Amino acid sequence: HCSKDETVAMAVRAQKAGMRIMINFHYSDTWADPAHQTKPKAWEGLNFEQLKEVLYTYTADVMTALKDAGVTPEWVQVGNEIPSGMVYPEGSTDNWPQLVELLNKGYDAVKEASPSSQVILHVDQGNNNERFRWWFDNATKYGAKYDIIGMSYYPYWLEGKPDYTLSIDD
């Protein structure tokens, strides 16, 4: 993970090199992936209302710092590989309404600072159309805001030639 200052410095450097910018909020003190969605230590002990507010404030703070540095990310990912949710345990898919409230706080914070940035919701196992369908059907049912579907696909971890095109075409 990177601090806000490190993120801004890298984004400025990448933009100066002509690269398109994507920011990925893991909302964790360490790498977040399907098996690890531990919220930051500083957020432990917060009630759900406080957790929503701190997620919004953190996202807005980073996005505003990027804007102030002249960087407009083309894409912003709210959560990293979140098939079972993010910011555990409150943001688990065991409680879709709460997860969607957190996702929407991230979305709103991004759009407030950078209206043109496209917000991504990112799920792994792109070859598993049933999983994608279940996840995005629930996200839609509960009102999740997003602009783009993000998909991870790791063929070297899978047997045979798994097909990811069903998830893309669906």
Predicted segments, located by residue:
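Conserved residues at the C-terminal ends of beta-strands
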Residues: 1, 79, 152
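N-terminal carbohydrate-binding/catalytic regions of secreted carbohydrate-active enzymes
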Residues: 1-16, 20
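Glycine-rich, aromatic-flanked loop segments that form ligand/cofactor-binding clefts
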Residues: 14-32
